[in-house]
């Protein structure tokens, strides 16, 4: 009787060990990658990663911000699998674009935003440039009320800053002003600061801030697709060389119809497939 009891206990123990071993093997097979960089692209990648995870159990996409410069430098160093950027790698000093592979997954428009108490509705490109250069200091100079202009610029490492400087400022240096890297922080400050102006990815714009037309054109997806709204950039996801494994799976998912036709538009971005023009690393725009 005692022997039968011992055999039963040994069998039970073996079963438990096999079960635990199986669980350990399943856990060991869990995969994860990290995608870091552009805060303008971050909401889209986070939303897509959540949806991807629902049908790919055990596969995790870690998404972090930090800015386009951070994304490019970290993917180049091999610290992360994907570097997110509003910039072409060729535009960033210290980045060897030849060693990186570009995956364009969306287009992001940049809206010019103001505090809601600002009653100006439209600016020309020249007026906007003069504001950020410090030549226009009061809203009354462009048809608004007597209210000092408070500039909130983006950090030097920001892809949005590069897009704005290339498109609006050209060779004109911006005046020294407060700088913020995070889209969310920019929106918060502008919403609370009388006379404030900045620029923000479409995906972050809400009713807490006002938006301006530029040269009579509103900041809409339709105007971006035709380049009537000039402030836009590709959203790049860079890999170091050819993508493999989970990285390839996720990038293929980002380019899939499911993401491009639903998540991209729902999150306030523009699908690559909807663009009527193409832009190169030099900023030259041509019909598609």
From Swiss-Prot:
Keyword Transcription regulation applies: no
One GO-annotated biological process of the protein: phosphate ion transport
Taxonomy, superkingdom: Bacteria
Keywords: Cell membrane, Lipoprotein, Membrane, Palmitate, Phosphate transport, Signal, Transport
Main location as per UniProt: membrane
GO annotations of cellular component type: plasma membrane
PROSITE patterns cross-referenced by the UniProt entry: PROKAR_LIPOPROTEIN
SUPFAM superfamilies named among the record's database cross-references: Periplasmic binding protein-like II
Pfam families, per the entry: PBP_like_2 (PF12849)
CDD domains: PBP2_phosphate_like_1
Signal peptide: 1-22
Covalently attached lipid (N-palmitoyl cysteine), positions: 23
Membrane topology, record value: Lipid-anchor
Lipidation (S-diacylglycerol cysteine): 23
Subunit structure: The complex is composed of two ATP-binding proteins (PstB), two transmembrane proteins (PstC and PstA) and a solute-binding protein (PstS).
NCBIfam families associated with the record: ptsS_2
Function, as annotated: Part of the ABC transporter complex PstSACB involved in phosphate import.
Protein's name in the database: Phosphate-binding protein PstS 1
Organism expressing this protein natively: Streptococcus agalactiae serotype V (strain ATCC BAA-611 / 2603 V/R)
High-level lineage: Bacteria, Bacillati, Bacillota, Bacilli, Lactobacillales
């Amino acid at each position: 009787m005692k022997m039968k009891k011992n055999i039963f206990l040994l069998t039970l123990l073996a079963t438990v060990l096999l079960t635990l071993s199986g669980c350990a093997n399943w856990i060991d097979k869990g995969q994860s990658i990290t995608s870091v960089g552009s805060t303008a692209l971050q909401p889209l990648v986070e939303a897509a990663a959540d949806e991807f995870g629902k049908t790919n159990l055990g596969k995790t996409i870690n998404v972090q911000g930090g800015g386009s410069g951070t994304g490019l430098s970290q993917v180049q160093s091999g610290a992360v699998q994907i570097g997110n950027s509003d910039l072409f790698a060729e535009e960033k000093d210290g980045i060897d674009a030849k060693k990186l592979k570009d995956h364009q997954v969306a287009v992001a428009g940049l809206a010019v935003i103001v505090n809601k108490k600002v009653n100006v509705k439209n600016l020309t490109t020249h007026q906007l440039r003069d504001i950020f250069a410090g030549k226009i200091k009061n809203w009354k100079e462009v048809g608004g009320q007597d209210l000092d202009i408070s500039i909130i610029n983006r950090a030097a490492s920001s892809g949005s800053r590069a897009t704005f400087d290339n498109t609006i400022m050209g060779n004109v240096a911006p005046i020294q002003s407060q700088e913020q890297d995070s889209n969310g922080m920019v929106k918060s400050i502008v919403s609370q600061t009388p006379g404030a102006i900045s620029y923000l990815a479409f995906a972050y714009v809400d009713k807490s801030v006002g938006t301006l037309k530029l040269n009579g054109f509103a900041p809409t997806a339709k105007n971006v697709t035709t380049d009537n709204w000039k402030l836009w950039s590709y959203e790049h996801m860079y890999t170091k060389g050819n993508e493999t494994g989970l990285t390839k799976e996720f990038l293929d998912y980002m380019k899939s119809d499911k993401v491009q036709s639903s998540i991209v538009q729902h999150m306030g971005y523009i699908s690559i497939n909807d663009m009527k023009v193409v832009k190169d690393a030099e900023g030259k725009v041509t019909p598609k």
